[in-house]
Every structure is written in C-alpha cells, then in structure tokens.
C-alpha cells in the first residue's frame, strides 16, 4: 500500500507567507507539549496536501530559544504530516558559499544550551527514553528531491553542508565563528536544532533549505553580520526558496514513501528504552 504524503512546511525569517498555499484553512492545534508558534495553515500546493507553520510566529515575535519546537513538530504530526521541509536563514562560514546561495544541509553541530531535544522526557504520553540515532541527520530521499528539483529549475545549489546551530539570539563572536570554521562547518544558524532531532523522533522525513544571508563575522574584510543585511538578503532571494518548495512538493508526492516511513518508525521504536523493574 502506497503511503499518502502530507508535507509540513516550517517557514523561517522571510518565508511565512500563507499565500503559497491554496484552499487555506487555519487550524488551532494544542498539543501535549504546548501551543505551536502560530496557527497551522492547511491547504494544497500543486494539488498536494500541505501544512504551513511560521516558526517564529507570523509577526516574528518569538526568539529562537523560545520557539516551542516540540509543539511545532508534534502539531504537524498530529495533522498527519509525513514530511517536513523547512527554510532557514544562515550565516556562511565558507568563502564559496555566497550570500543568497541555497544549501541543502546533510549534517549539524549542536551548540544550543537551553532547548529540550526529546519528546520522551518522562511525560505520561510517551514512555521510556529515546536514544535516536542522528546519522543520517536528514532524510536523504527528501534531500535528493530538493537537489534534483533545484537543478531542474536552473537554481544553483550546494548539495550538502554542515550547520552549526547556536543558542542565539546574539550572533557569534569572531572567535566562535573561526572555531566553527576549524570544525569544518559550512553554515551557522539558530533554529535547526532541536527541530531536526524532534522530527526524527516523530518519524517524519525532514529536510532543510538553508539560505546564506551573510558571512557571519569571520572575514577580515567586509561587513560583519547584522539584522538589516540578513533580512534584506533573505527578502531579495526568498523567491528561490519558495520556487524550490513549490516545484519539489509534487515530486515528493509522486514517490512511494511506504518503506522510508516504515524504516523511520522502526528506527524510533528500536531507539526507545522502556523502564523495567529490577
């Protein structure tokens, strides 16, 4: 039996416009883990069932540390999503990744300090402790669709990259930025973790479209990262992200995901250690 696809889209800075979805219906969802960042907007893109959620709220009022990542992911799961495709603004740590470039990340480094990274925290809904493996960190089949779609529409794309997620809301110091470069990271952002971890725990096929908006602050020449430039670059290039999402969604829906979803479910189930009596 072929699994029906429903795609959750989490929009970051500059990509929270519900107009990309047709036949929109707003859904207020309250989860066991609290209230999501905003209402969820259900509808269709290219005939495919989708749900759009603004990560920071539609008024961009929620700072990265205060996003209820668990509620966001669980709400998408509750509404029947099989996939989550997200956009994220990032700082480039590599000269060859220019502001305005698109990257499809394949790995991450976690430098957050305040965020709950599991649904299995002793609550009455989910028993046990989940030691979810994070290799691969992202759904490679979904990543492949995004990469192939980008090529097909003539959009230049970096086909992999490691993202360092920092706590924020401050930007990195120059010493931190250079340290991340020494670690081999390609990008720095504030939202990918714990989102990517929670999506895997929830058994969802998760992939990200990262846009480089700046060069962070590691370069000796050039302007250091600032909010105005980040927003201006994202606004100038956001159509690249929306075009990629709109064109990729029907390609995702055309594939049979039954085995992929089943394997994800098995990974979650075999990662849970249930309490036992001595």
Curated annotation (Swiss-Prot):
Reactions performed catalytically: S-methyl-5'-thioadenosine + phosphate = 5-(methylsulfanyl)-alpha-D-ribose 1-phosphate + adenine
Record pathway: Amino-acid biosynthesis; L-methionine biosynthesis via salvage pathway; S-methyl-5-thio-alpha-D-ribose 1-phosphate from S-methyl-5'-thioadenosine (phosphorylase route): step 1/1
Site (Important for substrate specificity): 172, 227
Gene3D superfamilies: Nucleoside phosphorylase domain (3.40.50.1580)
Residues where phosphate binds: 13, 55-56, 88-89, 191
Compartment(s): Cytoplasm; Nucleus
Binding site for substrate: 190, 214-216
Keyword annotations of the record: Cytoplasm, Glycosyltransferase, Nucleus, Purine salvage, Transferase
Catalytic activity, EC: 2.4.2.28
Highest taxon, organism lineage: Eukaryota
UniProt-recorded Gene Ontology molecular function terms: S-methyl-5-thioadenosine phosphorylase activity
NCBIfam families: MTAP
Function as written in the Swiss-Prot or TrEMBL entry: Catalyzes the reversible phosphorylation of S-methyl-5'-thioadenosine (MTA) to adenine and 5-methylthioribose-1-phosphate. Involved in the breakdown of MTA, a major by-product of polyamine biosynthesis. Responsible for the first step in the methionine salvage pathway after MTA has been generated from S-adenosylmethionine. Has broad substrate specificity with 6-aminopurine nucleosides as preferred substrates.
Family designation: Belongs to the PNP/MTAP phosphorylase family. MTAP subfamily.
Subunit relationships: Homotrimer.
Protein name: S-methyl-5'-thioadenosine phosphorylase
Biological source species: Anopheles gambiae
